[in-house]
Amino acid sequence: MRFHAHMVLRSVCGPHAHMSTWPFFALVLFSKVIGHAALKAKLIGNIREGRVAHAQLFMGPRGGGNLAMALAYARYLLCQDRDTVDACGKCSSCLQMNKLEHPDVHLEFPIFFTDKVKVCEPFTPQWRQTVLAEPYLDVEQWRDRLESENKQLRMGVDIAQEIQRKLSLRSFMGGYKVMLIWLPELMDAAAANKLLKVLEEPEPNTVFLLVSTDAEQLLATILSRAQLVKVSALRPTELVEAL
C-alpha cells in the first residue's frame, strides 16, 4: 500500500500538521530525507566514483520524496567539502543551497500562463519558499500556493527556451551546472521536443535532474536518455521513525 507523506504525518500528528512543522526539512541533506537508505548510499557512491549521468529521472509517487532526494543529490554534487555520507552543510555552496539560491542550480517547474508571463522566473522566489517549507510538495499544493484555482499548470515552449538560455551561461563556481525540472510530464509537445534536443547534445558538466510522478506522460525518447532513479513510496514506519 502506498502512503502519501502528508497523509501519514497527519494520522500521527493531527489533521492540521504538515511538513513545514518539521524544521529539519528546511535543510535538504541526504540525512534529512526520510527513508531510502539504500538509494542514498547508491547516489552518494555514484558521485564519489565519478559516475554522474548527465540526465537523471527521479521517479516516484506523489509525496514519496523524489523532489527532496533530487535536491539532496544536487547539494551533495556541488558541496565543496562532502564526506562519505552527506554534504557538509557549511561550505559556500551548501549555504547557498540552504535557500535554493545556488547560482549553478537552475529551477524549472509548471506554472499557469498569463498574457504576459509564460516562464518560471517571476515565480521562482515563491517556488523556492514553498519547497523549503514543503520538500514533499505535490502539484495540488503548488496550485494552491499560486491561487490558480482551476487553471491548468503546464510548461510551454517559452519555458524550454528559458532552459536553453540558462544552460548557455557559464558555471558561476566553475563546476557542475544543475538543471532541476520538477514535473516535466506537464510540458507540452513543443517544450518536450526542445528539451529532448538539449538532452541529446548536453553542455559539458551539465546535469539534468528530472523529478516526475508520471513517467508515462513523458516522451519515450526523453526516458531513453535519462538514467532512472526510482524513489519508492514511503512506508508509514519510516515516517513515524523520523518524528
Language model segments and positions:
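A short beta-strand-to-loop transition that corresponds to the Sensor-1 phosphate-sensing loop
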Residues: W182-L183, L210-A215, R235
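Loop/turn-to-beta-strand initiation segments
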Residues: M173-V178, E203-L209
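Conserved AAA+ ATPase "SRH/arginine-finger" region at the nucleotide-binding site
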Residues: L228-T237
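Short hydrophobic alpha-helical segments enriched in small aliphatic residues
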Residues: A5-M7, G14-M19, A26
